[in-house]
């Protein structure tokens, strides 16, 4: 049975902390396939500072090139509108019948799983991988995997804000992503 990891997020923009999560999960689980799953619109997040989706996909590909593993699953982008993980996983599972699916979330998402659409069915379809960046270890449900990762306080919001204020984002994102953001004039408004 094939082991597939899905790492979802808005990735607006993708940054160094996302890379650390991907790397830690990849090396811990050693999956056959690893997918970055950019959302079109998350139902649990406020939406502002949105850029053309092609920019996000380009920056994710830059991260994949740098990490040396991974692919992009753009199912939610193609579907458009609000993205419910349940719908995405259900469709993905139909395409990958003989696969064991792992879905990466942070402790912030773990602590609000009860708000997720069709969460009980979703728990039957995937094994949640809960990444914890806090000093305290996170207890998770028995059917889930907890992975402790180094704490790096970087957020996409912070990066967008720094760019709009004309501040440096060096090392917050890889050089290729930094150059792309500057070259395309993203987040400057």
From Swiss-Prot:
GO terms for molecular function: ATP binding; nicotinate-nucleotide adenylyltransferase activity. It catalyses: nicotinate beta-D-ribonucleotide + ATP + H(+) = deamido-NAD(+) + diphosphate. Gene3D superfamilies: HUPs. InterPro entries: Cyt_trans-like, NadD/NMNAT, Rossmann-like_a/b/a_fold. Pathway: Cofactor biosynthesis; NAD(+) biosynthesis; deamido-NAD(+) from nicotinate D-ribonucleotide: step 1/1. Its EC number is 2.7.7.18. It comes from the Bacteria. Keywords: ATP-binding, NAD, Nucleotide-binding, Nucleotidyltransferase, Pyridine nucleotide biosynthesis, Transferase. GO terms for biological process: NAD biosynthetic process. Catalyzes the reversible adenylation of nicotinate mononucleotide (NaMN) to nicotinic acid adenine dinucleotide (NaAD). Belongs to the NadD family. HAMAP family: NaMN_adenylyltr. This is Probable nicotinate-nucleotide adenylyltransferase. It comes from Staphylococcus aureus (strain COL).
């Amino acid at each position: 049975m094939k082991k597939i990891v899905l790492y979802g997020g808005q990735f607006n923009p993708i940054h160094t902390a996302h890379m650390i999560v991907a790397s830690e999960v990849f090396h811990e689980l050693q999956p056959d396939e690893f997918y970055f799953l950019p959302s079109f619109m998350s139902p649990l997040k406020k939406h502002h500072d949105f850029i053309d989706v092609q920019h996000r996909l380009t920056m994710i590909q830059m991260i994949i090139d740098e990490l040396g593993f991974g692919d992009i699953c753009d199912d939610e982008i193609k579907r458009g509108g609000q993205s419910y993980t349940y719908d995405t996983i259900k469709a993905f599972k139909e395409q990958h019948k003989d696969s064991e699916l792992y879905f990466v979330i942070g402790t912030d998402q773990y602590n609000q799983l009860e708000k997720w659409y069709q969460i009980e069915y979703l728990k039957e379809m995937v094994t949640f991988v809960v990444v914890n960046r806090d000093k305290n270890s996170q207890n998770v449900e028995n059917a889930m995997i907890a992975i402790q990762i180094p704490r790096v306080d970087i957020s996409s919001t912070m990066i967008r804000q720094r760019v709009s204020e004309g501040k440096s984002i060096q090392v917050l994102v890889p050089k290729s992503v930094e150059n792309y953001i500057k070259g395309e004039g993203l987040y400057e408004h």
